[in-house]
From Swiss-Prot:
Species this protein is from: Trypanosoma brucei brucei
Upper lineage: Eukaryota, Discoba, Euglenozoa, Kinetoplastea, Metakinetoplastina
Pfam families, alphabetized: Trypan_glycop
Keyword set includes Cell wall biogenesis/degradation: no
Protein known as: Transferrin receptor subunit ESAG7
Chain's gene name: ESAG7
Post-translational modification: N-glycosylated. Glycosylation is dispensable for heterodimer formation and host transferrin binding.
């Protein structure tokens, strides 16, 4: 009789532990999420710098146009160039293109603003998630981000997230050097997104299992996010990165999948394909649109500059921008008085 009593007591203890374990997020995954957030913030710098390059190319086109006009006025257009025979048509085309390029440049700037905004929103969603988890820490073994010991993760364990003691003021800002450096990396958006996929991280780098850390933020059953009930719908962190069924009791059995793959009340899914996560879809679409518009404008400007360059006289080609403006103004004044 005593044997069965002890066995039942042990079984009861195991069941109780299973139902009430509140796992913590692994600091490895938290740092990866923050690294992605930093990269997304860097997109704002990237689109701005690439837009500035296109603006410079358009300015160069205008200078080439002035060089050509000076060459025509001084009768110094290279006579051997077949493409320079109909110089009047070429000039008309250039002037018409300059107006078109200004409109396309404005379209590119609008596209860059939308891409930067989408990236900023996505970065904010990720940052808020990790910030909430990092702050959810008690003085003992109760916390929501784990480094595998009985103490919570501190800022030195989350250096991809915080530039000092955990707090809102130490989150990396868009003007910080780390963000600017991220913008200069040659990594493509899809590469950075894939770094947080389930297959890239693995379950052991996402959730600390087998320990009760008291983190109610990863529990949707009663005694979790709400006091005495399960939720009435599925739940997500990071806009679709970490997804929970509506009644997850703890001891997470995490698998790869998306928010729409959470088919049972106790399922937990970490994104397998970040390009399907809602907050990243706009970034992918709008950044691709910016690149498309930018590349089209750059190609047209280059073609026009190449056509102009063949017909510019050697002396005009050697003039600095200041010299060009000065001589062009002199000739315009002379023509005005004729």
């Amino acid at each position: 009789m005593r044997f069965w009593f002890v066995l039942l007591a042990l079984l009861g203890k195991e069941i109780y532990a299973y139902e009430n374990e509140r796992n913590a997020l692994n600091a490895t995954a938290a740092n990866k999420v923050c690294g992605l957030s930093t990269y997304l913030k860097g997109i704002a710098h990237r689109v701005n710098s690439e837009s500035a390059v296109v603006t410079e190319k358009l300015s160069d086109l205008k200078m080439r146009s002035i060089q050509l006009q000076l060459s025509v006025m001084r009768n110094r257009v290279p006579s051997g160039e077949q493409d320079c025979k109909d110089i009047r048509t070429l000039l008309k085309t250039v002037l018409r293109n300059e107006f078109t390029f200004q409109q396309e440049l404005e379209e590119m700037r609008n596209a860059s603003a939308l891409a930067a905004a989408a990236a900023g929103i996505a970065a904010g969603r990720l940052e808020e998630w990790i910030f909430v988890f990092a702050q959810a820490a008690g003085g003992s073994s109760q916390f929501c981000i784990s480094v595998g010991t009985n103490i919570p993760a501190e800022y030195n364990n989350l250096q991809e997230c915080f530039d000092g003691t955990i707090g809102p003021e130490t989150l990396y800002k868009i003007e910080d050097s780390r963000v600017k450096e991220s913008a200069q990396k040659s990594l493509q958006l899809h590469e950075v997104l894939s770094s947080i996929s389930f297959s890239s991280l693995g379950a052991e780098s996402i959730v600390e299992k087998g320990e009760n850390r008291g983190c109610n933020l990863m529990r949707t059953a009663d005694g979790g996010l709400l006091k005495d009930v399960c939720l009435n719908r599925n739940f997500t962190w990071g806009g679709g990165v970490l997804n929970f069924g509506y009644c997850v009791a703890g001891n997470l059995k995490i698998k790869g999948g998306e928010y729409g793959d959470v088919g049972s009340h106790d399922a937990v899914r970490w994104t397998e394909d970040p390009s399907k996560v809602s907050i990243f879809k706009d970034v992918i679409r709008l950044f691709a649109r910016f690149q498309e518009v930018k590349n089209a404008v750059v190609k047209k400007i280059k073609t026009t500059v190449d056509e102009l360059t063949k017909c510019i006289g050697q002396k005009e080609a050697e003039l600095t921008n200041d010299q060009l403006y000065e001589e062009f103004e002199v000739i315009q004044k002379y023509l005005w008085f004729l």
